[in-house]
C-alpha cells in the first residue's frame, strides 16, 4: 500500500514534470495520472504521446515514484460509437496505452451516462456493451479497467442522482461484463453525495472487486474533492469498513478541490500536509 495523488490540479499550475518533483518531494510514493481535462496542446494529446509517456516514466523512476492507477478522459457521450472511429473512444484507448507505459495496473473509465429522454434504455446493459468493446485493449496493454460509482446533477431540484451509484449496481455491471480485466473504484465522496454513507457503501461492496479508491472529503452538498478532514465525512467509519474489507489497494487522493486554490509557491507545503494525512490513513488500514 502506497500513498498517491492525482496529477490534474498540479499539472494545471506547474506542468507534469514539476508536478512529479513536488509529489516526490512531499513524500508521496505514487501518482494517479489524470488523462482528463487535458488542454489540446498537451503532449498526451499529440502524435508522440507514447514517447512523452516514456519520458515521464523515466523521470518517475529517477524520483522513485510509481503510477499504479490512472484516470481516463470522460468525454464519451450517449450515442458515440464503441470503436476507434469515435474520437472519444479513441481517447480512452490512447489513455489506456499511455497509462500502461507509466506502469498503471488499472485505469478508471467512467460509464456512459444515458440522458433522461432515453431513459427506457437500460444503463447497465448499455455499459456492458461499452466496456466489452474496451476489453481487447485491456489484454493488449496489460491493464485493467476500474468502474467508478458516479452521479448526475439534477438542476431542477439542485440534487444529485447516482449513476452506477450503488455498490450493488457497480458489482452487477462488473459481473455482467464477464471479464477479470474489470474491477471497482469507489469514490468515497460520490457515495456520500448520492445518499449512501461511505462506510455503508464500502460494507455493501463485494470486497473481491474493490481494487482502488478515489479518496476525497466533502460536505454532502457538492462534489468538493477536499483532503480528508477538510469536510464532514466520518473517517473513523470509512477506515473501519476498509479494514474489515481487507482493502489492500493504495491510499489514493483525488483532491483537486483542496489543491486548486493553493498558490504554486505553497504547493510544497500543501502536498507535504496531504502526504502526512495519507500516512495517517495508511497507518490505520
Residue ranges: model-predicted function:
Residues 1-4, 12-27, 61, 89, ...:
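Histidine-acidic metal/acid-base catalytic patches
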Residues 6-10, 34-36, 72-75, 112-114, ...:
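Active-site beta-loop-alpha junctions enriched in small/polar residues
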Residues 19, 56, 95, 134, ...:
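Aromatic/hydrophobic pocket-lining residues that form π-stacking "cages" and hydrophobic walls in ligand
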Residues 29-35, 66-70, 107-108:
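Short, well-structured secondary-structure segments
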Residues 34-57:
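Glycine-rich, proline-tolerant flexible connector loops at the mouths of alpha/beta enzymes
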Residues 40-41, 77, 116, 154-155, ...:
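Generic structural signal for helix capping and beta-alpha/helix-loop junctions
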Residues 44-47, 82-84, 159-161, 225-229:
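Short glycine-enriched, charge-decorated loop/helix-capping segments at active-site entrances
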Residues 59-62, 78-183, 193, 273:
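Active-site acidic/histidine proton-transfer and metal-coordination neighborhood
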Amino acid at each position: 500500500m502506497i500513498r498517491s495523488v492525482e496529477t490534474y490540479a498540479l499539472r494545471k499550475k506547474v506542468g507534469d514534470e514539476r508536478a512529479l518533483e513536488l509529489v516526490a518531494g512531499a513524500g508521496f510514493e505514487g501518482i494517479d495520472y489524470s488523462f482528463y481535462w487535458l488542454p489540446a496542446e498537451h503532449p498526451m494529446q499529440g502524435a508522440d504521446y507514447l514517447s512523452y509517456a516514456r519520458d515521464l516514466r523515466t523521470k518517475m523512476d529517477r524520483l522513485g515514484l510509481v503510477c499504479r492507477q490512472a484516470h481516463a478522459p470522460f468525454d464519451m457521450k450517449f450515442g458515440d460509437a464503441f470503436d476507434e472511429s469515435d474520437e472519444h473512444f479513441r481517447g480512452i484507448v490512447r489513455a489506456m496505452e499511455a497509462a500502461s507505459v507509466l506502469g498503471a495496473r488499472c485505469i478508471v473509465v467512467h460509464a456512459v451516462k444515458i440522458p433522461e429522454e432515453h431513459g427506457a434504455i437500460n444503463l447497465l446493459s448499455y455499459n456492458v456493451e461499452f466496456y466489452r468493446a474496451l476489453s481487447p485493449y485491456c489484454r493488449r496493454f496489460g491493464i485493467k479497467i476500474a468502474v467508478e460509482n458516479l452521479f448526475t446533477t439534477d438542476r431542477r431540484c439542485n440534487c444529485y442522482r447516482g449513476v452506477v451509484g450503488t455498490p450493488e449496481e457497480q458489482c452487477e455491471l462488473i459481473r455482467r461484463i464477464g471479464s477479470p480485466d474489470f474491477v471497482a473504484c469507489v469514490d468515497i465522496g460520490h457515495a456520500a453525495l448520492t445518499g449512501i454513507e461511505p462506510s455503508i457503501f464500502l460494507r455493501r461492496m463485494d470486497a473481491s472487486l474493490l481494487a482502488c479508491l478515489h479518496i476525497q472529503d466533502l460536505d454532502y452538498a457538492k462534489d468538493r474533492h477536499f483532503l480528508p478532514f477538510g469536510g464532514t465525512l466520518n473517517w473513523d467509519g470509512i477506515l473501519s469498513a476498509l479494514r474489515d474489507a481487507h482493502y489492500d489497494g493504495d491510499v489514493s487522493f483525488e483532491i483537486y478541490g483542496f489543491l486548486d486554490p493553493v498558490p504554486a509557491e505553497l504547493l510544497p507545503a500543501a502536498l507535504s500536509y496531504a502526504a502526512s494525512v495519507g500516512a495517517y490513513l495508511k497507518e490505520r488500514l
